[in-house]
């Protein structure tokens, strides 16, 4: 399995269990998810082991169900909010941080990143009202923000991430 992590915070953003598509210019990764509902807090008897007593009533435990996009739930992404002005301020600082990381780790990616990033940011800002914003589990404001939107069918969620802001870890 391959896990994609934020190069700034080290937060897990997504893995290769999803359908991943690279943008035409190679700047963005589009990750397709699904809407899911899962029970939380429910303990499966098979995990406990032993036999359930027939004499004593099972006290059980409270369980709740959580619904959302599988990418967000599985990787513990945290929702945050931005408007056009605040996202513009964030993305300027983020681009500088990614550029600095690229200069250390992949100097050959700096020029393509700086050349293509403004066009991607312009696309994002033009569509900003449709996006939901998610940080990694640490909620570090300097880290990557994943952008969640839905396809034209209104049902299929997908997230967009800057490819150069991710590091790949094989498990």
Swiss-Prot record:
GO terms for molecular function: calcium ion binding. It is found in: Cytoplasm. PROSITE patterns: TCTP_1, TCTP_2, TCTP_3. GO terms for cellular component: cytoplasm. Keywords: Calcium, Cytoplasm. Residues 1-171 form the TCTP domain. It comes from the Eukaryota. Belongs to the TCTP family. Involved in calcium binding and microtubule stabilization. This is Translationally-controlled tumor protein homolog.
